[in-house]
From Swiss-Prot:
Listed name of the protein: Protein SprT
Residues annotated as catalytic: E70
GO BP term (any one): response to stress
Taxonomic path: Bacteria, Pseudomonadati, Pseudomonadota, Gammaproteobacteria, Alteromonadales
Cofactor note: Binds 1 zinc ion.
Protein keywords: Cytoplasm, Metal-binding, Zinc
Main location: cytoplasm
Family of the protein in this entry: Belongs to the SprT family.
An example Gene Ontology molecular-function term: zinc ion binding
Location relative to the cell: Cytoplasm
Required cofactor names: Zn(2+)
HAMAP family: SprT
Binding-site residues for Zn(2+), renumbered to this chain: H69, H73
Organism: Shewanella oneidensis (strain ATCC 700550 / JCM 31522 / CIP 106686 / LMG 19005 / NCIMB 14063 / MR-1)
Length: 156
């Protein structure tokens, strides 16, 4: 599947070079993204990262939508410089070059990549915190208050 992604990236770049009548440097591609994001484009490094779990579960949509979406970010940066991430320049590349609706988010099932929750307690009952917030509590970086009763959350 990763080879198909690399081939799709090359196809997209050939399409872009024909459309814009100029050459573009090919990005470094990694399959190391975790969490609920399908892909990210690192503009200054000319690098793409894809989520291998979501790729495996949604291969057709990755080829059709996610790869062009992320490449559009890199192309937008290389053509226009710094712009809004999903601004009109990016939308134009999505629509005119790739002929894809410029959606900013995917609608993949993310149950398999969902982060772990940890149960905390306050005066009014149990509250679940995501792993990132839980780790901040463990490191002593912060304490959280319940939005309802305004008491500090404690690990259950």
């Amino acid at each position: 599947m990763q080879q198909q992604i690399l081939e799709r990236i090359e196809d997209c770049y050939q399409q872009a070079e024909a459309y814009f009548k100029r050459a573009f440097p090919r990005p470094t591609t990694q399959f190391t993204l975790r969490g609920r994001s399908a892909g990210t484009a690192h503009l200054q490094q000319n690098r793409l990262r894809f989520n291998p779990v979501l790729l495996r579960e949604n291969s057709e949509a990755f080829l059709a939508e996610v790869v062009p979406h992320e490449i559009s970010h890199l192309l937008c940066f290389q053509i226009f410089g710094k712009t809004k991430p999903h601004g009109r320049e990016w939308q134009s590349i999505m629509l005119k070059l790739f002929k894809i609706s410029p959606n900013t988010t995917h609608n993949f099932d993310t149950q398999s990549v969902k982060g772990k929750d940890v149960e905390y307690r306050c005066a009014c009952g149990p509250i679940r915190l995501g792993i990132r917030r839980h780790n901040k509590v463990l490191r002593g970086e912060t304490r959280y208050l319940c939005k309802r009763c305004h008491t500090h959350l404690t690990l259950a």
